[in-house]
């Protein structure tokens, strides 16, 4: 498995600007995605991290990795768990002092874009997507995935009307009939699929966007 793919799966970013270690803190604050099932949640639920570190660990849920970056920049969060490579790269490119401290496996089928079923658009007629309105969280892994998929089908970002929206909000909007296409991950992605279909999945998607 390529490192680029595993980084896309889970980028843990450390707010190095705090200049402190965990043992010097009264409390460690960790950002995470509530609807993103990961093995660490067992230890989180059973407070095993608190026990190992000797201090309370406060877990704060976020809807997107970009929000995690903002929280770390303000000092409100010390570590972002499963932030995603795209938000990390965007933040560090802008000068934010973050450090990747661990990586995990790829999650190709748990991050995708969904087209409204009534449009009857699939991988064979993607030209019909031109001019459609898409809701996605800009600057995240879902955004990168969207760009990779439309590029594979010969489309450009300028072919769409894009609205910056978190997966949680876009899944709700999609269910109420808004938007032609939405992109997201985890629990919101499952809800999106109740009203639409993906263009690529499995090995085909892995080959295009990882």
Which functions belong to the PLM regions below?
Residues 24-37, 55-61, 131-135, 161-163:
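Short, well-ordered beta-strand elements
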Residues 33-36, 63-65, 79-89, 94, ...:
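Beta->alpha turn/N-cap motifs
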Residues 34-61, 67, 90-93, 150:
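Short, polar/charged alpha-helical segment
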Residues 42-56, 143-161, 193-195:
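Ligand-binding cleft/hinge of the Venus flytrap
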Residues 59-70, 83-85, 155-176, 187:
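Short helix-initiation/N-cap motifs at beta->coil->alpha
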Residues 73-83, 94-98, 132-133, 175-184, ...:
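Alpha-to-beta junction loops
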Residues 162-163, 169-210:
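Pocket-lining segment of extracytoplasmic ligand-binding domains
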């Amino acid at each position: 498995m390529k490192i680029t793919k595993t980084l896309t799966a889970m980028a843990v970013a450390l707010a190095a600007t705090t200049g402190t270690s965990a043992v010097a803190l009264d409390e460690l604050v960790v950002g995470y995605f509530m609807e993103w099932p990961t093995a660490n949640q067992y230890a989180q639920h059973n407070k095993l991290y608190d026990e190992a570190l000797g201090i309370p660990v406060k877990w704060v849920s976020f809807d997107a990795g970009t929000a995690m970056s903002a929280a770390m920049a303000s000092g409100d969060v010390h570590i972002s768990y499963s932030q995603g490579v795209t938000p990390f790269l965007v933040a560090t490119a802008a000068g934010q002092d973050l450090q990747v401290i661990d990586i995990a496996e790829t999650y190709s089928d748990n991050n995708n874009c969904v087209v409204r079923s009534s449009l009857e658009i699939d991988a064979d007629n993607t030209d019909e997507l031109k001019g459609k309105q898409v809701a996605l969280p800009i600057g995240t892994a879902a955004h990168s995935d969207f760009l990779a998929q439309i590029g594979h089908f010969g489309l450009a970002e300028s072919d769409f009307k894009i609205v910056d929206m978190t997966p949680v909000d876009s899944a709700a909007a999609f269910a109420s009939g808004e938007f032609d296409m939405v992109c997201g991950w985890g629990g919101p992605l499952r809800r999106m699929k109740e009203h639409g279909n993906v263009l690529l999945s499995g090995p085909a998607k892995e080959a295009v966007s990882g």
